[in-house]
């Protein structure tokens, strides 16, 4: 039973095929706002495909994705995504990249810069504001990706292997940030092949294996 006012994301019986290859076979799970949901599975189990369907990158072949019982209106619902493949524009300045993405997600220019500066400060990254992305360490690039996912204050936050490549200090910081997002009532979905993180964080778990839960 969901708590009042929190959103519920449901995948009902999702199938996905690419040509002859069946990747997802009747995948169903429910993720609630204000809780962390973990999607656990080996590489190739269908985690990324499930995420891409939630994000509307491509449609499911069958089944439905619902938010509060209705199809998701992607113009109204903000999604934040930290991909496992960390893609950045190397020659851009940190502030330009981040403000660009926040504006892309519907923020006004001033609002975007304000939000980005808040997050740079929150993650101890203010000194890198006017640096080029390709001058940053891997861990700091990952923090930039996290800001890209969170600056526009999304309703649904999807974190794909968020702790891989982080040193202990940054891992702790990320954990704090994620707990904060959960306490704000957001739907936070973790995807990982590492049980330890999922167990530590998540209130409920779906284990994907060969395209099934």
Regions found by a protein language model. Give the residues of each.
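Catalytic Walker B motif of ABC-type/P-loop ATPase nucleotide-binding domains
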Residues: 157-160
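Conserved ABC ATPase signature
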Residues: 132-136
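A short, surface-exposed alpha-helical micro-motif characterized by mixed small hydrophobic
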Residues: 198-200
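Conserved ABC ATPase "signature" region
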Residues: 99, 103, 110-128
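Conserved ABC transporter NBD signature motif
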Residues: 63-77
């Amino acid at each position: 039973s969901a708590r009042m006012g929190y959103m519920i994301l449901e995948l009902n019986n999702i199938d996905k095929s690419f040509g002859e290859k069946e990747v997802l076979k009747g995948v169903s799970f429910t993720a609630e706002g204000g809780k962390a949901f973990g999607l656990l599975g080996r590489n190739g189990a269908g985690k990324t495909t499930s995420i891409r369907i939630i994000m509307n990158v491509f449609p499911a072949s069958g089944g439905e994705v619902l938010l509060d019982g209705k199809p998701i209106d992607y113009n109204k619902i903000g999604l934040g995504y930290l991909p496992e493949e960390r893609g950045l524009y190397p020659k851009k300045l940190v502030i330009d990249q981040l403000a660009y993405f926040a504006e892309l997600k519907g923020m006004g220019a001033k609002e975007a810069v304000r939000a980005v500066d808040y997050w740079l400060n929150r993650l101890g990254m203010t000194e890198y504001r006017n640096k080029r992305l390709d001058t940053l360490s891997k861990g700091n690039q990952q923090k930039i990706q996290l800001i890209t996912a969170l600056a526009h204050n999304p309703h649904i936050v999807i974190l794909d292997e968020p702790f891989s490549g982080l040193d202990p200090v940054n891992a702790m910081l990320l954990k704090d940030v994620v707990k904060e997002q959960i306490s704000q009532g957001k739907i936070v979905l973790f995807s990982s092949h590492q049980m330890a993180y999922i167990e530590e964080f998540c209130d409920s778990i779906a284990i994907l294996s060969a395209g099934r839960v």
